[in-house]
C-alpha cells in the first residue's frame, strides 16, 4: 500500500516501453514524493525514469509481448544478490522438498 512508502521502503518498478509507460512514470513520481527508494528496470536509453529512480537496471528494447521474459532476469539476479547479502542459503532454500512421483 502507498501509505507504507517512506525513505526506508525500497520499491521495485518495471518501467519498460509499453502502453502503460506514462502511468508507471506517474506512479514513480508519486513514490518519489513520499521519499521512497526506487529500483527500476528500464529500457536501454530511457532518460525519464533514469532521472527519477535511485537505482536502474537496463534491459534491451524488445517488443511488449516479450518484455516479461527480458525483465525477469534482472529481477531474479536482484533477489539472488539480496539473499546472499542477507546470508541466506540460495542453494538449499528452507521448506523446499523434492517430490518424486513414480507410476
Residue ranges and their predicted role:
Residues 1-103:
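A SIS-like phosphosugar-recognition module
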Amino acid at each position: 500500500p502507498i501509505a507504507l512508502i517512506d525513505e526506508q521502503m525500497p520499491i521495485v518498478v518495471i518501467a519498460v516501453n509499453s502502453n502503460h509507460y506514462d502511468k508507471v512514470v506517474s506512479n514513480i513520481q508519486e513514490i518519489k514524493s513520499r521519499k521512497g527508494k526506487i529500483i527500476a528496470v528500464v529500457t536501454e536509453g530511457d532518460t525519464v525514469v533514469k532521472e527519477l529512480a535511485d537505482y536502474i537496471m537496463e534491459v534491451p528494447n524488445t517488443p511488449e509481448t516479450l518484455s516479461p521474459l527480458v525483465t525477469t532476469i534482472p529481477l531474479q539476479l536482484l533477489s539472488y544478490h539480496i539473499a546472499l547479502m542477507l546470508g541466506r542459503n540460495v542453494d538449499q532454500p528452507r521448506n523446499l522438498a523434492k517430490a518424486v512421483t513414480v507410476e
